[in-house]
């Protein structure tokens, strides 16, 4: 790897206007908030939290460009370029690489029942076309794709596949991956399981709630790495109270409302997602006050 990619990342939120267009100024504010206020190490751009799969190619490029402009070279940047259209994934990968992103990431192809060989070659094709490092995005609950330890071994044999964003509750597989590949990067993708993932030896984490709860996540990560498990768990309990409440109100509109409370122009979610339900306003205000969000 050209840059040490260990650490904590915001899965960058993207603000939209009423017509579903990207609010560039708001996006810059959200990116800067993640780095300057939440004190995170980097941004994971155009992932699920960016509502990526609702965007067209030009909007995805726009998000890559604006996020890069917002934070420059001072932080780590990972570009999620995965797409069912391999040509789009390659086009996005080339664009992000030209912008100076430190690594690419790509969700496994989904919807159709692809063979492992097809999935493997999808990654190899993106790498060949871009010559950038690749982080596998494993999120089987949404893709239906479960990668075995033997298949991870085949993927990791490629020198440019440097790691995995592991968003799965299978901690046995996580332990097996960590033991088998001590030099590969493992970034946890479940905010609500950060303490468990850290104990299992991950190198960092990527989270949507880190856009508003990154400092608490940092404390969890550091305490768990230092062996202060009871203290880390107490903070994880607090984080999970936040996460549970946010999920109950709709994750993307609620996170954007918390950012709006900070005078950030966080915009709307993209349709068909609904905007924040004002019936939840009192619950949200209480959450912000209780946990200093």
Curated annotation (Swiss-Prot):
It is found in: Cytoplasm. It catalyses: aceneuramate = aldehydo-N-acetyl-D-mannosamine + pyruvate. Its EC number is 4.1.3.3. Keywords: Carbohydrate metabolism, Cytoplasm, Lyase, Schiff base. GO terms for biological process: carbohydrate metabolic process; N-acetylneuraminate catabolic process. Aceneuramate binds at residues 48-49, 167, 189, 191-192, 208. Catalyzes the reversible aldol cleavage of N-acetylneuraminic acid (sialic acid; Neu5Ac) to form pyruvate and N-acetylmannosamine (ManNAc) via a Schiff base intermediate. Homotetramer. Its main location: cytoplasm. Signal peptide: none annotated. The active site is at 137 (proton donor), 165 (schiff-base intermediate with substrate). Pathway: Amino-sugar metabolism; N-acetylneuraminate degradation; D-fructose 6-phosphate from N-acetylneuraminate: step 1/5. Belongs to the DapA family. NanA subfamily. PROSITE patterns: DHDPS_2. It comes from the Bacteria. GO terms for molecular function: N-acetylneuraminate lyase activity. This is N-acetylneuraminate lyase.
């Amino acid at each position: 790897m050209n840059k040490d990619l260990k650490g904590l990342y915001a899965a960058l939120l993207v603000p939209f206007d009423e017509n579903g267009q990207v609010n560039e100024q708001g996006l810059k504010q959200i990116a800067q908030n993640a780095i300057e206020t939440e004190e995170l190490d980097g941004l994971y751009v155009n992932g699920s939290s960016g509502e990526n799969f609702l965007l067209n190619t030009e909007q995805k490029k726009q998000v890559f460009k604006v996020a890069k402009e917002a934070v420059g070279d001072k932080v780590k940047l990972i570009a999620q370029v995965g797409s069912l259209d391999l040509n789009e994934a390659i086009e996005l990968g080339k664009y992000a690489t030209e912008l100076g992103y430190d690594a690419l990431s790509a969700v496994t192809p989904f919807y159709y029942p692809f063979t492992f060989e097809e999935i493997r070659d999808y990654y190899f094709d993106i790498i060949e076309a871009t010559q950038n490092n690749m982080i596998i995005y494993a999120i089987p609950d949404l893709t239906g794709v479960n990668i075995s330890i033997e298949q991870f071994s085949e993927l990791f044999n490629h020198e440019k596949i440097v790691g995995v964003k592991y968003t799965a509750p299978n901690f046995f597989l996580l332990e097996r991956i960590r033991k088998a590949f001590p030099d590969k990067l493992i970034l946890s993708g479940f905010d609500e399981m950060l303490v468990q993932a850290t104990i299992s030896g991950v190198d960092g984490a990527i989270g949507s709630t880190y856009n508003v709860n990154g400092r608490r996540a940092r404390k969890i990560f550091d305490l768990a790495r230092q062996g202060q498990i009871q203290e880390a768990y107490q903070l994880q309990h607090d984080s999970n109270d936040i996460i549970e409440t946010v999920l109950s109100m709709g994750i993307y509109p609620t996170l954007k409302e918390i950012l709006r409370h900070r005078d950030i122009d966080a915009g709307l979610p993209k349709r068909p997602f609904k905007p924040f339900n004002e019936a939840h306003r009192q619950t949200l205000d209480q959450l912000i006050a209780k946990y200093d969000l």
